[in-house]
């Protein structure tokens, strides 16, 4: 499982022109782009959620937990693109939707159980994601 994290001052995700998730924190929040690969499981999703919740990437070396910062979760299978051969990426390392969808939902649920305010995109949908990266700060978590 890979989670590409961006510290933001605001973010929104639209599907078919309609906002389906948005965060507008008083200070900073996080956008988590989540990719799932073969062999990922619920334990991995929970561990990465806890790592994200406690990751000290907000102002003053604070975590989302410290600041009660909101998190926008977006599924993104392209985090497992393989560009080693040719000019067209392979997606073979990305788990199929039937595996990935429940694990991304479990990741978001684990964040909520930890106390996070979580917004989310729509799994499998074509989404337009708008965000204002603050810093910029972008970190890759892998588990």
From Swiss-Prot:
* EC number, as in UniProt: 3.1.1.96
User: Where is motif Gly-cisPro motif, important for rejection of L-amino acids found?
Assistant: 135-136
Q: List GO molecular-function terms, semicolon-separated.
A: D-tyrosyl-tRNA(Tyr) deacylase activity; Gly-tRNA(Ala) deacylase activity; Ser(Gly)-tRNA(Ala) hydrolase activity; tRNA binding
Give me any GO biological process, just one: D-amino acid catabolic process
Catalytic activity, as annotated: glycyl-tRNA(Ala) + H2O = tRNA(Ala) + glycine + H(+); a D-aminoacyl-tRNA + H2O = a tRNA + a D-alpha-amino acid + H(+)
The UniProt entry, under CDD domains, shows: Dtyr_deacylase
From which domain of life does this come? Bacteria
- State any GO CC term: cytoplasm
Matching entries from NCBIfam families are given as: D-aminoacyl-tRNA deacylase
Question: What exactly does this protein do?
Answer: An aminoacyl-tRNA editing enzyme that deacylates mischarged D-aminoacyl-tRNAs. Also deacylates mischarged glycyl-tRNA(Ala), protecting cells against glycine mischarging by AlaRS. Acts via tRNA-based rather than protein-based catalysis; rejects L-amino acids rather than detecting D-amino acids in the active site. By recycling D-aminoacyl-tRNA to D-amino acids and free tRNA molecules, this enzyme counteracts the toxicity associated with the formation of D-aminoacyl-tRNA entities in vivo and helps enforce protein L-homochirality.
Stated family: Belongs to the DTD family.
Q: How does it assemble?
A: Homodimer.
Name of the protein: D-aminoacyl-tRNA deacylase
* Encoding gene, per UniProt annotation: dtd
């Amino acid at each position: 499982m890979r989670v590409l994290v961006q510290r933001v001052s605001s973010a929104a995700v639209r599907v078919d022109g309609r906002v389906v998730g948005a965060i507008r924190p008083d200070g900073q929040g996080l956008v988590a782009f989540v990719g799932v690969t073969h062999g990922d499981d619920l334990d991995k999703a929970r561990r990465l959620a806890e790592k994200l919740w406690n990751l000290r990437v907000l102002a003053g070396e604070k975590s989302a937990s410290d600041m009660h910062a909101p998190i926008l979760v977006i599924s993104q299978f392209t985090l497992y693109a393989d560009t080693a051969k040719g000019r067209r990426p392979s997606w073979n390392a990305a788990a199929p939707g039937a595996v990935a969808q429940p694990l991304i939902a479990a990741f978001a649920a684990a964040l909520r159980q930890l106390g996070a305010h979580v917004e989310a995109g729509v799994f499998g949908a074509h989404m337009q994601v708008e965000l204002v990266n603050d810093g910029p700060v972008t970190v890759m978590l892998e588990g």
